[in-house]
């Protein structure tokens, strides 16, 4: 009976974690005018493919996807998630036409880059709790920056720039900049999102 209880508690804690994360992102999305994205953010986490894996590998201090990847060599939950959520740069990886690489990143629309920044802030808050500082999302990004060759250069530059605003000037100024400057300057594209 104690194993059943432990599994139930992990499921409840995982649900609480994803609900809290979703609410943090939604609040920030609403603050910058991204209402639809705020409402729809990470809904795939409630599907059986992602939710059941999250319950099984829940630890509370990091993504269950990392634990699944360590256990079986791949995260089925992550593969499902990135394919359905446009705020992940991995969603935008496609075959390359440059002849140098097999795959490459397509440029992300700014509304999804903005959501990605809010996602990173909220994930850091969720996993770090009271230890969270506004430098954490940038520090986390910088740890892997040199390995992220498959992100489109413009997306990479914009992501780092927004994280630096958070680090140097704080969340309030970041959200103001996103709403009144960044989202108003979407580069022209022939792609329909």
What does each of the following model-derived ranges do?
Residues 1-5:
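Short, small-residue-biased leader/transition segments that mark boundaries at the very start
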Residues 7-193:
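Metal-dependent phosphohydrolase cores
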């Amino acid at each position: 009976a104690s194993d059943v209880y432990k599994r139930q508690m992990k499921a409840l804690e995982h649900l609480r974690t994803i609900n809290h994360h979703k609410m943090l992102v939604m609040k920030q999305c609403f603050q910058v005018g991204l209402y639809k994205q705020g409402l729809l953010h990470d809904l795939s986490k409630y599907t059986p493919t992602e939710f059941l894996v999250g319950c099984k590998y829940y630890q509370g201090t990091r993504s269950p996807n990392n634990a699944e990847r360590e256990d079986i060599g791949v995260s089925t939950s992550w593969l499902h998630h990135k394919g359905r959520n446009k705020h992940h740069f991995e969603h935008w990886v496609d075959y390359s036409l440059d002849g140098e690489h097999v795959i490459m990143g397509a440029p992300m629309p700014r509304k999804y880059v903005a959501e990605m920044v809010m996602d990173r802030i909220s994930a850091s808050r969720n996993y770090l709790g009271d230890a969270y500082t506004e430098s954490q999302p940038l520090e986390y990004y910088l740890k892997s920056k040199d390995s992220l060759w498959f992100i489109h250069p413009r997306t990479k530059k914009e992501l780092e720039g927004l994280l630096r605003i958070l680090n140097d000037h704080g969340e309030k100024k970041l959200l103001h900049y996103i709403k009144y400057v960044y989202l108003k300057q979407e580069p022209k594209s022939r792609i329909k999102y």
